[in-house]
Amino acid sequence: MSSSAIDADISPASLAARFAAGPQLHAPDEAEKRCADWLADVPAELAAPIRAVADRCPNLRIALQSIAEASPYLFDLIRADPARLLRLLRSEPETGFRALLDATAAAVATASDEAEVMAVLRRMKAEAALSIALCDIGGLWPVLQVTQALTDLAVQSVQMTLRFLLRQEAARGRIHPPNPDAPEERSGLIVLAMGKMGAGELNYSSDIDLIVFYELDAPTLAPDIEPQPFFVRVTQGLSRILQQRRHDGYVFRVDLRLRPDPASTPVALSTASALNYYEREGRTWERAAMIKARACAGDVVAGEALLSEIAPFVWRKHLDFAALSDVHDMKRQMQTFRGQTEVAVEGHNVKVGRGGIREIEFFAQTQQLIAGGRHPELRVRPTLAALDILANRDWITFQARDELSAAYQFLRRVEHRIQMIADEQTHTLPDSIEAVERFSRFFGYASREAFARDLLAHLDCVQGHYSKLFEGDPTGTAKLPIDYAGGAEDTVLLDHLRALGYKKPLMVATTLQQWMAGGYRILKVEATQRAFNDFVPALIEELARAEEPDNAVNAFDRLLQALHRGGRLISLLSQNRDLLTLIALVLGAAPRLGDMLARQPQIMDGLIDPRFFGAMPDRTELSARLAATLSDAGSYEEFLDRLRLFGQESLFLIGTRILSGTVSTQQASIAFADVAEGIVGTVHDLVSKQFVSQYGRIKDQETAILAMGKLGSREMTAASDLDLILIYDFDHEQPDSDGERSLHGAQYFARFTQRLISAFTTRTNYGVLYDVDMRLRPSGRAGPLASRLDSFAEYQEVEAWTWEHLALTRARVISASPEFRARIEQVIRAVLTRPRDAAIANDVAEMRAAIAQEKGEGDVWDLKYAAGGMVDIDFIAQYLQLVHAATMPDILAVGTLSAIDNAARLGVLAQPDADVLRPAARLYHDLTQILRLCVSDKFKPETAGDDLLRVLVRAGDAPDFSSLQARVKETQAEVRAIFNRLIGGNGE
């Protein structure tokens, strides 16, 4: 192609010609080869002009190579339709985007059925997603133009779909619209766009948050049609058309859970019930959510009228104490990120992590809620517009506005680039340095270091401004002359406690009097008592910020009573307000951790380590810490006690990080497993040396510890025991040990295993290391404690039940010599990859039924055993591995999520099923991690404290607990349906 022809193909206004900036390549040769291989398969009449355009525009060429290297999602869009790519590159993106929306609207208007509408909308989504991504990557559009385009796409999708559905209803005679071409007008059906969609700030792979209302006297409804069933059916159709996953993808995931009381209300609500709810029961988060609400589809006039009626709920006229308490409520949602002294770039969540997008949004929304009632100009939806008005009204400095605005735009670009990789609604940077290096190049940086420098600067800046907003004591109570020892007769003290938010001031005052009188063991030392008395005012104000202040006082009182020594603890708390906040959270939400702290106050040392809020330690760092802990132990008993203390501290620190939201539950699971694995290996070595010193060795002896269950799959919780199997081998010709007290083969290893179990389970003042369960060994309780390798192999090959092979999919050798490890892994792989008939589904179904009979499956919050719970997902993953491993050994994985990913990738699990099972497993795991940490018995929502419910809501990424419970129920139903279809069962 000649240069003039190329120039003619590329107008100055085209996307290709305007491609000014772009990514950098991580592996240039490989990226270039991927593009070349792709173009080699493209018809010549398309490949030549694409190649010519790319050669004419070097930035574009590099960007296409980077997409091939870093973004499977975008590269799939490119490969799916080369003609579409060429058309986008040659056209002006602004007019092309508008033309795409118009053409889609016209196609939907003439569509004959729902299937055609779904296909048309998905073609629009694919083209828009590619076009918007290229405009973002190439620097054609600033981030606010990108978010507006994404929002326009979502709004148009909702409007087109709703119009199609209402036209169908009109054709059936159920509504009589005055304008058949626009049946939504005067329909009484209101669709509110919430969150980022309402503000024109939608992110690249975002869900769309909608609330649907209807007027009971909807004027176009036929007289014989009941409003609620009709509008619920339309809403369900809207959701189905937009989010149902098909071979050609989906349009938008739809979230309807921001409506009032979603667990017990239909997906469409009457405006009368909505107004009644917001007036009587509306909560702080709902006020904040309504700041961004916008009538986006349906009867927009009625929607705007509804928002006007809701406005008094959102915008309060007076800044009374209750309003200030609401503001602190919002602050506490972000409180979990206070106290972080460093940010770990790897694995950082740019939305809700320290210094992230959410802090900027809360910074603006908090002040909007405070002042928006008296200053209507603050009632704006976009975050940056709110910051601008706050600066103009002297609520914040212009420097703060500029810095927060710059950070917001930078972090939104990071968020988009993360989501472009795989079209997933994630906000978290990769976990490894190498992966962040690749991401940095995709984002346009020359190195991870350069990207990290800018990222950290923005995060630190945001956190600084956010923290300053809440400095000082907004209630003014700190200046009052309070006698904290005054007791229940002191009216000034009682008034002060009420003002702080205590509901039982008499009880709190009596407790304070006991504290100040030094009646507890740790307060007998005068210096400690004096330090504590000075600390009480700050303590009582900090505990007042708990969700249940009175319970927090009781929990701290129990801690004081249980402490044998505590001067250093009180000193630490009195000098570190953030540490006190963290301890208040622990005491309020996780009494189990509070009891641990009372028994071993020294485990708090880890909380003041500057690295505590940084990246989770890897195995190498854990090994170094463990070695340092044990370095000068003087005896076997002291060695084990130090191990117990190390284990207790590790559990406490990881648990505290879960509660504070500074580590994901997935990261916590791996951390729990890494700690356990390090301890198991250490105990194995220690017991081996001690045992050999007594009984000697058997020639060529080997021992290995095989981890099963949650340790094997690296999915541990704070309450997990250790499922272990000990496997051994030795020279058959010389079966006796060579020590002074010689033992014969099997007896030697049985006694060794007993010694090992004792080291784990013996309780001392430092607690126990772990509870150990060895029932997964061959023949269970009826079999020997330890298994010789050839006996283990024979049992698995000949005698093992199907359930034992299911369990074996999680088996992982965690302590052994490299040679013995390899032999065991070979045996396990041979067992798992032998041919099996799909008829083993009957065995799996019978096992599931037996478990249900024994454990029950009707408790929604028994996340493991409930119908559609984690056991169902585990069985699906394990069943698919057993059935297909013979022909597809790559399906094998010890972790459930990895097994699901493998099964989907290999085509033995339908992608829609995988798309249900993955988030279900993550949800169950996230919630289980919290429940195991905080609840020692069955979880009962009706008796659970607000602190725990709040942590669960955050873990489940829900607006409130009722929404979370609704999501759990819905998820269990979906999982059980898949289980029944793949494996069988009645689903009861």
Swiss-Prot record:
The keyword Nucleotide-binding applies. Keywords: ATP-binding, Magnesium, Multifunctional enzyme, Nucleotide-binding, Nucleotidyltransferase, Transferase. It is an enzyme of class 2 (transferase). One of its GO terms (biological process) is regulation of glutamine family amino acid metabolic process. One of its GO terms (cellular component) is cytosol. InterPro entries: GlnE, GlnE_rpt_dom, NT_sf, PII_UdlTrfase/GS_AdlTrfase. Its EC number is 2.7.7.89, 2.7.7.42. Its cofactor is Mg(2+). It catalyses: [glutamine synthetase]-O(4)-(5'-adenylyl)-L-tyrosine + phosphate = [glutamine synthetase]-L-tyrosine + ADP; [glutamine synthetase]-L-tyrosine + ATP = [glutamine synthetase]-O(4)-(5'-adenylyl)-L-tyrosine + diphosphate. GO terms for molecular function: [glutamate-ammonia-ligase] adenylyltransferase activity; [glutamine synthetase]-adenylyl-L-tyrosine phosphorylase activity; ATP binding; magnesium ion binding. Residues 480-988 are annotated as: Adenylyl transferase. The keyword ATP-binding applies. Signal peptide: none annotated. Residues 1-474 are annotated as: Adenylyl removase. PANTHER family: BIFUNCTIONAL GLUTAMINE SYNTHETASE ADENYLYLTRANSFERASE_ADENYLYL-REMOVING ENZYME, GLUTAMINE SYNTHETASE ADENYLYLTRANSFERASE. Belongs to the GlnE family. Involved in the regulation of glutamine synthetase GlnA, a key enzyme in the process to assimilate ammonia. When cellular nitrogen levels are high, the C-terminal adenylyl transferase (AT) inactivates GlnA by covalent transfer of an adenylyl group from ATP to specific tyrosine residue of GlnA, thus reducing its activity. Conversely, when nitrogen levels are low, the N-terminal adenylyl removase (AR) activates GlnA by removing the adenylyl group by phosphorolysis, increasing its activity. This is Bifunctional glutamine synthetase adenylyltransferase/adenylyl-removing enzyme. It comes from Rhodopseudomonas palustris (strain HaA2). The lineage of its organism: Bacteria, Pseudomonadati, Pseudomonadota, Alphaproteobacteria, Hyphomicrobiales.
